[in-house]
Amino acid sequence: MEPDVGGSNPPSCTKLMNKKIFKPRSEWPAGFVDRQEEELLARDLLISNIKKVMAKYGFQYLETPSFEFTDSIGKFLPDKDRPSEGVFSFEDDKKWLSLRYDLTAPLARYAAKNFNNLPRPFKRYQLGTVWRNEKPGPGRFREFLQFDADYIGTSNLFADAELCCLISEILSTCGLTKKEFIIKISNRKLTKGLLEKLKINDENKQSIVLRAIDKLDRVGLEGVQYLLGKGRKDKSGDFTKGAELDESQIKDIINFLSIKDLSDNNFEKIEKIAGDNQTILDGVNELILIKKYFSLLKFDNFKFDPTVVRGLEYYTGPIFEANLTFGVTNNKGEEIEFGSIGGGGRYDDLVRRFNNQDCPSTGISVGLDRLIYAILQKNKIKVEKESPILICVFDEKYMDYYVKILNLLRTKDISAEIYSGTANIKSQLKYADKRGCNYVILCGDDEVSNNSVTIKNLEIGKQMSNSLKDRDDWKESSGSQKTVAFDQLLNEIK
């Protein structure tokens, strides 16, 4: 529509002047974050180490879409009647789509779709971004990079044991010692059998109980008791509805959670709790077998912990969780225990949902951004960052000479750039300092006419500036810069 420039009622200038100009916010949404180069380089190094470990263990690389049909994963959402609860979803052409909240549900869909063509067991690993519509916290984001490794199509518990060894090896490549992480193991059949024995048959109530147990490290024993009962209000005032169990049921669950290792005495305690419940007894026998495989694999950095239940509902057997045992500093400057960076377990029924085919499977996941957050705080990973050489611009008329230097450096795979802008040399040197440049190249009338370059070592310059007493000392000292012939440039900066 064309503006009316000749009408008798022009728009009011006062109204136009008073109209507020919209300014979008420069903040990110809660649970999302910009990631800087240091973190991204650490991520690249970690991914490189992961790929080496996965090749050694014989896993194949796979990638699945970021979006899935919500009904493919909806059964496992916190509330399947509210597609946006727990995940980010939208309706497209009368069908609900959701951003994947993990990499396991998409893998199950992939395995069902390609069931007849895949070797079984199918050993795959994947690296990809996932999204959770949940309350964020320190090192816990709504968008994060996740790593998964899975066995599809095997009931052999050696696969479960090997996954624990695999994660342990990956954490070791991050510079973590055995004292700085632990693999906790349990079995979903123990809690499933306990729910059967206590006659907690309502599926929704079962889910609340499992999520309550899973939160023990975060909310404490008293918090779990509230979540098993009427419910719990957190520090922000948000209320989480509880399972509304009776006091006897709550007491039995708390007693079960007090068992802390896989000693013969504790196996007997669990069997006593089980009575004639075969589900619990099966879970105990599976843990005994996994413990045997750990011994064969010479893996001892694990412990039994019945509070490990894993929040997702598709687990059916052995489950495991990788925990960091050291503390980190949160945004308030407080020292907190970091806790879980990943976990997994056996999910024998997940593929069957799609094709009604028996396909026992097991897998493990690690939140890489959460792991990187921790290891960077502890300086556990050293990232080699190549700083560029800055070619300063004295005069635009010498641009051909500057480009000649640039081409020489880049043909030798040396990071270099010509300053882009109109700032003076002092400002260009400040720019180089902010970029972390170790060298700058200075070329004015003398250098161009003599086919030479002046190389300034900023690192040496910083050291000298701390020891020089006055301006005269600085002028007399030439240790931080050197003029050489053009063909000697590469020799000087190597």
What are these model-derived regions, one by one?
Residues 6-7:
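Short, positively charged low-complexity motifs
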Residues 34, 188-189, 193-200, 251:
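Phosphate-rich ligand and nucleic-acid binding surfaces
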Residues 17-105, 161-165, 169, 176, ...:
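TRNA-binding/sensing appendages of the translation machinery
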Residues 42-57, 68-69, 104-116, 123-177, ...:
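Positively charged, Gly/Ser-enriched RNA/tRNA-binding surfaces
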Residues 3, 16:
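Cationic, low-complexity basic patches in intrinsically disordered or flexible, solvent-exposed regions
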Residues 78-80, 197-201, 456-457:
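Short secondary-structure boundary/capping segments
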Residues 82-94, 199-230, 324-328:
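Acidic, His- and aromatic-enriched active-site or binding-groove loops in soluble protein domains
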